[in-house]
Amino acid sequence: KTWDLHVKDVFRVPLEENLKMISDTVSYLKSKDKTVFYDAEHFFDGYKSNADYAIKTVFVARDAGADCIIPCDTNGGTITSEFVEIVKEVLAKLDCPVGVHCHNDCDMAVANSVAAVQAGCVQVQGTFNGYGERCGNADLVSVIGNLKLKLGIDCVSGARLKELTETSRFVAEISNVKQRENQPFVGNTAFTHK
């Protein structure tokens, strides 16, 4: 946990013990030759509450050998300008790869994910069609579409880009969730203009 509120009220352990748990867990996984992506759950809420502690948690994970640090906007409530400011501070302080994991409770997940890549993040966690708990996660269809087509960032090959619509529809079908007609990039009404 990266939010001191959760450490105290959910884990019910002292803040230093939580740091030790993070270190021990990452160290154990690295001792087993695992690649470790440390998802810093509730990082943005934690940062807004106690920035020093939230940053300490990711330092501890990095120092224990995490291969990539992933600050998570678990509540999906961080506005893009504030999100980018926090991401830039994390990037300035860490000398390891950084990614992001955004939920979509306030409809900011795609914008925040794209902005994070523009700021220097090297990984985006998301889901096809944005499916996920509550209001969902960053829709990888839109993230990929914007990074590749709007910003020219080579995040997927041209062949993979051509598979977005088919993959999106396949995921909708196996999830038994009707694909939105107006889903950006792949919906039936995308790019239909008068």
PLM regions: where:
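Short glycine/serine/threonine-rich phosphate/pyrophosphate-binding segments
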Residues: D105-A111
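Beta-strand segments within the central parallel beta-sheet cores of soluble alpha/beta enzyme folds
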Residues: P71-D73, G99-C102, G126-N129, S157-E166, ...
